[in-house]
Amino acid sequence: MTDEPLRTLQFLLSRLERISADSAVAYRASGVRGSMLRMVEKLEEGKPVSGQDVKRLTDSAYLLLKKAAREKIR
């Protein structure tokens, strides 16, 4: 696997941790962040991860970031 999934996950982690604790999506974002952190650890250790799992987590993270952004502009 290339470094691209690792960089993407690290980018998303940095954005997810900025979601306000008062946000309606904060609890879910926390769970997604935990899963992403475990996946980043595996990637950094050189252990295999499923491309499908990476896609699922990145899709979830982008969706949560969109929801948090919509919530913020209201």
What does each model-found stretch correspond to?
Residues 1-18, 24-27, 31, 38-74:
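Long, non-catalytic architectural segments outside compact domain cores
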